[in-house]
């Protein structure tokens, strides 16, 4: 089994940033929208200046203007823009020529998810599939039925897109998710303790993931 790409999202302090930068993650996610994990572009800029890392940086936006997204992506040299609101395929198409970043669209798991993936395919580089919880955009800590993960993975791979699975992923559930062979995993609350990223949880998650991958080749 190929090791999935990993994104640690909701980084909200220099300490979080340092832990994630030293981890085995591929992507570090920053939320620029209303959330308990919200940060400012200025904060992220300071962390980037003080901590050297080769991790890719993802900015998460919710119903933000195209102009503001493009400006923040340019100022921070974001590797990825994640559209996590009610953005349309047309919004993603309008954003494309304004940025150098990859564009991902977050979609909620449901009956229409595969159709939405197809609709966004011409305009984005990847997807984040998350649980559908009324009144919440993400960071719920609640998993959806991972039996559908192979369908999402296949559709994304056929279109040459990245696909991350989010919602309810933590050290206790990671093995169950890996059985579905996701190509990407996205975590926020699953590696937090008392609202902060936790080194012990990160280490435990990565140990279990690496072990499963090593015995599944």
Swiss-Prot record:
SUPFAM superfamilies: Ribulose-phoshate binding barrel (SSF51366). InterPro entries: Aldolase_TIM, PRAI_dom, RibuloseP-bd_barrel, TrpF_fam. Pathway: Amino-acid biosynthesis; L-tryptophan biosynthesis; L-tryptophan from chorismate: step 3/5. It comes from the Bacteria. This is N-(5'-phosphoribosyl)anthranilate isomerase. The keyword Amino-acid biosynthesis applies. GO terms for biological process: L-tryptophan biosynthetic process. Belongs to the TrpF family. Keywords: Amino-acid biosynthesis, Aromatic amino acid biosynthesis, Isomerase, Tryptophan biosynthesis. It catalyses: N-(5-phospho-beta-D-ribosyl)anthranilate = 1-(2-carboxyphenylamino)-1-deoxy-D-ribulose 5-phosphate. Pfam families: PRAI. Gene3D superfamilies: Aldolase class I. Its EC number is 5.3.1.24. It is an enzyme of class 5 (isomerase). GO terms for molecular function: phosphoribosylanthranilate isomerase activity.
């Amino acid at each position: 089994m190929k090791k999935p790409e990993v994104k640690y999202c909701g980084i909200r302090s220099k300490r979080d940033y340092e832990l994630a930068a030293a981890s085995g993650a591929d992507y570090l996610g920053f939320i620029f929208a209303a959330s308990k994990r919200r940060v400012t572009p200025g904060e992220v800029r300071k962390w980037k200046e003080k901590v050297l890392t080769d991790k890719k940086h993802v900015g998460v936006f919710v119903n933000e203007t195209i102009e503001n997204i493009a400006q923040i992506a340019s100022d921070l040299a974001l590797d990825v823009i994640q559209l996590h609101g009610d953005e349309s395929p047309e919004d993603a198409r309008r954003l494309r020529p304004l940025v150098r970043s990859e564009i991902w669209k977050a979609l909620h798991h449901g009956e229409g998810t595969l159709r939405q993936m197809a609709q966004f395919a011409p305009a984005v580089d990847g997807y984040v599939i998350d649980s559908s919880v009324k009144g919440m955009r993400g960071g719920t800590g609640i998993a959806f039925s991972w039996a559908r993960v192979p369908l999402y993975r296949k559709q994304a791979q056929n279109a040459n897109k990245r696909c991350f699975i989010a919602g309810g992923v933590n050290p206790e559930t990671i093995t169950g998710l890996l059985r579905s062979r996701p190509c990407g995993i996205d975590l926020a609350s699953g590696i937090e303790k008392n609202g902060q990223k936790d080194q012990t949880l990160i280490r435990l998650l990565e140990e279990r993931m690496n072990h499963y991958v090593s015995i599944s080749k």
